[in-house]
Amino acid sequence: SLNTKNDFMRF
């Protein structure tokens, strides 16, 4: 996504 950190949180 636009934010990698946000992606990690999703996983």
UniProtKB/Swiss-Prot annotation:
Keywords attached to this entry: Amidation, Neuropeptide, Secreted
Record carries keyword Secreted: yes
GO annotation, cellular component aspect: extracellular region
UniProt keyword Secreted present: yes
Modified residues (Phenylalanine amide): F11
Biological process (GO), any one: neuropeptide signaling pathway
Major site of localization recorded for this protein: secreted
Subcellular location: Secreted
Transmembrane region(s): none
Family: Belongs to the FARP (FMRFamide related peptide) family.
Protein name: FMRFamide-11
